[in-house]
Amino acid sequence: MPQNTLNIVILAAGKGTRMYSKMPKVLHEIGGETMLGRVIDTAAALNPQNICVVVGHGKEQVLDTVKRDVVWVEQTEQLGTGHAVKTALPHLAAEGRTLVLYGDVPLIDVETLETLLEAAGNEVGLLTDVPADPSGLGRIIRDSSGSVTAIVEEKDADAAQKAVKEINTGILVLPNAKLEAWLNSLSSNNAQGEYYLTDLIAKAVADGIKIHPVQVRSSHLAAGVNNKLQLAELERIFQTEQAQELLKAGVTLRDPARFDLRGRLKHGQDVVIDVNCIFEGKIELGDNVEIGANCVIKNAKIGANSKIAPFSHLEGCEVGENNQIGPYARLRPQAKLADDVHVGNFVEIKNAAIGKGTKANHLTYIGDAEVGSKTNFGAGTIIANYDGVHKHKTVIGDEVRIGSNCVLVSPVKIGNKVTTGAGSTITRNVEDGKLALARSRQTIIDGWVRPEKNKQ
């Protein structure tokens, strides 16, 4: 097998006690994706022979949540990082290299790992950092010539070693030909009573194998998450980087510090996004799209020149060109709007196709429907699509005028150019061009005396 064969082991067995959560630590999210999912995707971009993920606490929940084509290996006892890698040995090639990553180091990137792999060659590569505060972290020990000789965990370090600022990030590259022997020779005779993966550095030095340290270009790339504060700090760094990339690409963000992207955003030119907007999943924004403040948009496609007014919520929908949506509008999954559609305040559309030029400007629910072009919904229109057991479809033609406060009881068909009187409850099909009225006649009672409060 060629020496450049790459295996990747991702350690994800920890409980994450300091997260104070019933959820396994690696399932907490950065930018709308689990930390472990992010690390696996980064690892996959290196085109390894295989990826082994070592799981332990919450194994079933991890496997159910993180749907990836990897080898899952269970560490039944939490005996340290060295023991965790050892559990993956049966799945690693006899030759080549193994890169060790961590499921709670979510922002590690391909560029950093490629640099480390190149530096390591077929020897040992070690990713290091010099953080502002190295407390609690393993120190990189060098000899008088500057060569790395060992990593000492802080609990096992003496005063001189604790004074060292350079720390071990935990990410390293190891030659497979030596890996099994080194792991089998590990001892748990230390302050933690665990098998430290970091002890392999001293073993490599003893075997005459050179250690190639690479300092990470920015501390956050190798930062681990142990509590919710650290999770929030990395989330903000991640969001800042995404905002910067969008700004460089020509998107106008009214305030980059108040923007969240939890997925992928494809955009045209002259897109404007106001403050406090959240984008989730796969988003596509056409040219000249404007998103008002405080909108939530998830898995949506919005056509050119469309305006989404503040406080609107769009999910799983398609919006055509030149649409006016909101404020306070809600487009639910399978809502498909053609061009020049107006959807106003407190209008909800779900699983409905809306034709070109149609308007629903106020207080309307359109569900499980097919609506033609240039139709107008009066305020308070409701499509009653659910009978308590099944959903039913309503079909409405072109140039229909639905009066205010109407109820269309599905299934029903409304023909082209139909008008329904305000306050009508429509339960039967209406042919083209007809006027449909379904309400009781107004009665005026003369001589009626209105009750008054007794003033005493």
Swiss-Prot record:
Class of enzymatic activity (EC top level): transferase
Pathway: Nucleotide-sugar biosynthesis; UDP-N-acetyl-alpha-D-glucosamine biosynthesis; N-acetyl-alpha-D-glucosamine 1-phosphate from alpha-D-glucosamine 6-phosphate (route II): step 2/2; Nucleotide-sugar biosynthesis; UDP-N-acetyl-alpha-D-glucosamine biosynthesis; UDP-N-acetyl-alpha-D-glucosamine from N-acetyl-alpha-D-glucosamine 1-phosphate: step 1/1; Bacterial outer membrane biogenesis; LPS lipid A biosynthesis
GO CC aspect terms: cytoplasm; membrane
UniProt-listed Gene3D superfamilies: Hexapeptide repeat proteins (2.160.10.10), Spore Coat Polysaccharide Biosynthesis Protein SpsA, Chain A (3.90.550.10)
Domain of life: Bacteria
Binding sites annotated in the UniProt record for Mg(2+): D104, N226
Binding site for UDP-N-acetyl-alpha-D-glucosamine: 11-14, 25, 75, 80-81, 102-104, 138, 153, 168, 226, 332, 350, 365, 376
Localization terms from the record: Cytoplasm
Names of required cofactors: Mg(2+)
Keywords: Acyltransferase, Cell shape, Cell wall biogenesis/degradation, Cytoplasm, Magnesium, Metal-binding, Multifunctional enzyme, Nucleotidyltransferase, Peptidoglycan synthesis, Repeat, Transferase
EC assignment: 2.7.7.23, 2.3.1.157
Region named Linker: 229-249
Gene Ontology biological process terms in this record: cell morphogenesis; cell wall organization; lipid A biosynthetic process; peptidoglycan biosynthetic process; regulation of cell shape; UDP-N-acetylglucosamine biosynthetic process
Stretch list, region N-acetyltransferase: 250-456
Record note on cofactor: Binds 1 Mg(2+) ion per subunit.
Active site: H362 (proton acceptor)
Database matches in Pfam families: Hexapep, NTP_transf_3
Complex and partners: Homotrimer.
Function: Catalyzes the last two sequential reactions in the de novo biosynthetic pathway for UDP-N-acetylglucosamine (UDP-GlcNAc). The C-terminal domain catalyzes the transfer of acetyl group from acetyl coenzyme A to glucosamine-1-phosphate (GlcN-1-P) to produce N-acetylglucosamine-1-phosphate (GlcNAc-1-P), which is converted into UDP-GlcNAc by the transfer of uridine 5-monophosphate (from uridine 5-triphosphate), a reaction catalyzed by the N-terminal domain.
Record-given protein name: Bifunctional protein GlmU
Gene, per the UniProt record: glmU
